[in-house]
Curated annotation (Swiss-Prot):
Residues 412-640 form the Ras-GEF domain. PANTHER family: BUD SITE SELECTION PROTEIN 5, GUANINE NUCLEOTIDE EXCHANGE FACTOR. Gene3D superfamilies: Ras guanine-nucleotide exchange factors catalytic domain. This is Bud site selection protein 5.
Length: 642
């Protein structure tokens, strides 16, 4: 070993001794800053080495492989091979393997070869392994032979070669997992005890990852690492113990509502008290870590002190467990992307069909749509293909005034209804689960964006109807098309606007057919009997499992009504009134269920969407500046009788 390499080896050894020392003492010495500078220098040097400290480099290079690996969906290679082995030991007539089984066998081996080839190209240590080269060459040879000779002997040869190949691969995967655990522990210690800027930590991780582009975000790196780990774990499964998972509904019920009676830090302390830190068999109780993981991933709100306590808990008790490396990645993402609320992953609460009784819709809206013969043809919309409104909605959310030509209602009602539906659906799907219960405490949420779009649409319907009285029939056809598309939010905005006093006092002439349609659409969103008709309609849509945009303000109103109308604690004051929060969680579960379906078979023109949003913004600005505008325009049309 050269003097330079020996110096680096001593430095690394000193670093690990130092880590162990300060972890035991729980105190920091005065040379902490120098120590982290030394870590930076050592890690930078490691990038230049080919043979020395290869485990650290292998941990990273073996995981950040080509993104093509993520596109290969393999169920479980070992299970596939085992099934093939069992099936081929059964007697077959003439010793011929059925074509379907043979094709499945070829596909499984091909996917195994493709996946491992991606890793081999990116990982020098794997590339230099003669055992892997020999095992791969033998498997490749037997696989080619399988195409020409489809007898049982050829199949068993491939099975045997595949198992040998997997056996050679397994130690490398174990090394990746072990090295990654060490890497994560060091990063966690750096975050906990290093008095450094978070951007410096990000740059350090990117340096270790071998990324030249420092714009490559840390959370993307960690997500990529975890994706590859999951992939390799499926490809080469190891026998890990299964941890107990809390009920999805019970977890959501607690994590959605606990802030009504306690704080984030108080909840964490209660959870940590429930964790058996003295018991050596801590792995037998995984309910607490699992609940914390769900909390961090799906129900988190800004609380940096609590997040540091969770990181400390992970570092002290969970770092040695492979299944909790994802929790570490989640914590780091929240450290870097500081946001009031950030849903890293959706945990579905679950709602059974039995909880919502199926019934016939009070209004057969599909037949009603056919009766009024709405024209559904629009060549421009169909030619535009898949519609991506994300950039347009981002500009709209930022309050940018979209510079467009004046939007005239010359598009078909069907085309306008599709545009409204896709805009409303995009916003509704972006609502994070926790927003449904915490909306009343925060501003600038996605729910606020949904309300803003509804208000802008209401103002636009009101203005265009007052200025051009003949458009009332047009808007009724748009409303009917929205109902047919199950966009109940836009339907409510349009029908409510058309019932505004400023319009009704004009006594606009309307044909009998349109008036009949107006009366039938009014019933759907009428508040009579607590919106009975609307609720029966949405339940029918729920069971149809079709995409839908619900009347969002009614969802929030229901949650607010339950929260404000019921006591948080029981009458004796000793227990939390869980019946109240069960009702809230069921409403959120219902709202979340409706987010699982997307509109994939309808499209709209981006030009139409941009023009519509621009026109609605301009009109709504007029109504914000003058709250009496609608009445003033109405008076100008038909003066009051004196």
């Amino acid at each position: 070993m050269s003097p330079k390499n020996k110096y680096v080896y001593i430095c690394v050894e000193y670093i690990y001794i130092y880590f162990a020392k300060i972890h035991k003492q729980s105190t920091l010495s005065s040379d902490t800053t120098k120590m982290f500078v030394l870590i930076d220098n050592v890690l930078a040097y490691l990038l230049e080495q080919d043979d020395l400290f290869v485990t650290a480099r292998f941990a990273i290079q073996g995981q950040i492989v080509s993104r093509r690996v993520n596109k290969i969906h393999i169920s479980n290679i070992t299970d596939v091979l085992l099934q093939q082995f069992i099936s081929h030991t059964l007697p077959y007539n003439d010793n011929i393997v059925p074509k379907k089984i043979l094709d499945s066998m070829r596909t499984a081996v091909r996917q195994l070869l493709e996946a491992t080839a991606c890793v081999s190209r990116e990982c020098p240590l794997v590339k230099r392994s003669q055992d892997i080269k020999r095992a791969r060459k033998r498997l490749l040879s037997d696989w080619y032979r399988l195409g020409a000779d489809a007898n049982m002997d050829a199949v068993l040869l491939v099975v045997n070669s595949a198992w040998r190949f997997l056996a050679v691969w397994r130690p490398f995967v174990n090394s990746i997992q072990h090295a990654t655990q060490e890497l994560y522990q060091n990063i966690a210690h750096y975050l906990l005890h290093g008095n450094v800027n978070i951007q410096r930590v990000t740059a350090l991780i990117q340096l270790v990852m071998g990324q030249d582009d420092l714009l490559f975000s840390m959370d993307d790196v960690l997500q990529e690492v975890f994706r590859i780990q999951l992939y390799l774990n499926k490809m080469l499964p190891h026998n890990s113990h299964k941890w107990q998972k809390p009920s999805p509904f019970d977890s959501a019920n607690l994590l959605l509502n606990f802030r009504d009676w306690t704080t984030d830090n108080a909840l964490l302390q209660e959870l940590l008290l429930s964790y058996p830190t003295i018991n050596k068999n801590k792995h037998k109780n995984h309910s607490v870590p699992r609940l914390i993981q769900i909390w961090v991933e799906s129900y988190w709100q800004d609380s940096e002190t609590t997040l540091k306590d969770i990181l400390n808990f992970w570092y002290s008790h969970l770092a040695e467990y492979y299944e909790y490396q994802e929790l570490f990645a989640d914590i780091v993402q929240l450290f870097i992307n500081k946001k009031r609320t950030r849903q890293l992953k959706i945990h579905y609460i679950g709602l059974t069909d039995k909880e919502i009784e199926e019934n016939k819709p009070p209004l057969d809206y599909e037949n009603l749509f056919l009766q009024y013969e709405i024209d559904k043809t629009n060549a421009n919309d169909e030619l535009c293909g898949a519609t991506d409104l994300s950039d347009l909605l981002f500009q709209w959310k930022q309050g940018e005034l979209l510079e467009v030509e004046a939007f005239a209602l010359n598009v078909s009602p069907w085309s306008l209804a599709k545009t409204l539906t896709l805009l409303e659906s995009s916003l509704y799907l972006d609502i994070e689960t926790i927003e449904f219960t915490r909306h009343f405490k925060h501003n600038d949420t996605t729910i606020d964006s949904v309300f803003t779009l509804s208000n802008q649409l209401s103002s636009y319907v009101l203005e265009t109807t007052l200025q051009q009285t003949h458009t009332i029939s047009y808007w009724l056809q748009v409303a009917l098309s929205c109902l047919y598309l199950r966009n109940l939010n836009s339907l409510a905005s349009i029908i409510t606007s058309l019932q505004n006093h400023s319009i009704e006092r004009l006594s606009l002439p309307i044909d009998v057919k349109s008036d009949h349609l107006f009366q039938r659409l009014k019933v759907v969103v009428h508040p009579n009997n607590n919106y009975n008709v609307y609720r029966r309609t949405i339940k029918h849509i729920f069971h149809s499992q079709l995409p839908c945009v619900p009347f969002t303000s009614l969802l929030i109103r229901d949650i607010t009504f339950i929260r404000d109308g019921n006591d948080t604690f029981t009458k004796d004051g000793n227990n939390v009134n869980m019946q109240k929060f069960n009702q809230i969680t069921k409403i959120v579960a219902f709202a979340q269920y409706l987010q699982q379906k997307q509109y994939e078979d309808i499209h709209c023109s981006n030009t139409t969407a941009r023009s519509l949003l621009g026109a609605m913004i301009k009109v709504h600005t007029l109504y914000n500046d003058n709250k009496d505008r609608a009445y003033q325009v109405s008076i100008a049309k038909v003066p009051r009788l004196t």
